[in-house]
Amino acid sequence: MCFTLKNNTIAKKTKKKYNTFVVLTNVNYKHIKFILKRGNQLQNYVFITDSDSDLPYNIVDERKIEMIYMSYNINGEEFFDDLGRNQAHKKYYDDMRAGSVPRTTALPSNYFVEYFSTFLKEGKDILYLAFSSQLSANIFNVFMAKEELLAKYPDRKIIVVDTLSISYPQAILVIMAHDLYKEGKSIEEVANWVEENKLRSQAWFTVDDLKYLQRGGRISAVSAVVGSLLNIKPIITESKEGKIVSIDKIKGRKKSLHYIAQKVADNLDENVDPHLTIIHADALDDANMLAEKIKELVPNIEKIEFSFIGSVIGAHCGPGTVAACFFGKKRAN
């Protein structure tokens, strides 16, 4: 992108701030500054993620992020996770407690062909920050669609980044990458930043009822029964490979929340904004308890946000799940 400016000092200032080439001439600097601040409108690529990020819909709307809504099924009826816009999270978890059994499936490749085609027809390139390839066949269907579309649109770019994350760790990467997008960074620059930093986005979970992990095949039926009888709460995290792994078992809910708070304290990086967010599956009291313990261990923490775990992720972990998500040190597990 090239803009012309009237004075060398302003030219240098603009080049440094907005990373754009400038030529000296008589142009109103304020007008150029306004145009450059609209970076997302000037970009020749679209910024896309999916609802498995559990990104709150108000942030999606505010940032105008393109969103792929993942699907789930209840009693043969298909729904799409709309991030709580029309489908209340609390009701969803109340229904699960009452016996509702949501099941999730990957979107077919033809869905992505149709979705991406909308932008490719407009001459736009595509950057898609996808949830972890280790948790679904979804990303493989994306790559099938990409191959088909590039044969039809050989002059376009489709960059798919496997974030190796799901739920709010993915959302944190999306928010930070979208800031770069708004600054006018190229599609390659944004994709490379995510690749280089994705293992710094962490989540530490604990579930309330083991039957949901057992139903999803994460633990055996025997382990679920024994664990429930002994009030065992597994500690779950996202691994370096992008898998969901159980790394410890703690007896009692309060102790499990304290364990997570300590993991947060151990893994924060004081040199960056952690975007610390506690997510929960209709367990706000426990989320607040976790927040208070984190503040006790990390007194200088400036802000802790709260958000819901979405429908697709919640189908696997169940009501009562609580997690702390943040951007910090690289994952060790």
Question: Which residues does each PLM region occupy?
Answer:
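Mixed-charge interfacial surface used for oligomerization/domain docking
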Residues: 39, 44, 52-61, 65-71, ...
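N-terminal glycine-rich anion-binding loop in soluble enzyme alpha/beta folds
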Residues: 46-106, 111
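Cationic, amphipathic, low-complexity segments that mediate targeting or membrane/lipid association
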Residues: 8-11
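Short, Lys/Arg-enriched N-terminal segments with co-localized hydrophobic residues
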Residues: 16-41
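Glycine-rich phosphate- or other oxyanion-binding loops that anchor nucleotides, phosphorylated ligands
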Residues: 97-128, 132-135, 140-144, 191
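A short glycine/small-residue-enriched secondary-structure motif
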Residues: 86-93, 116, 121, 148
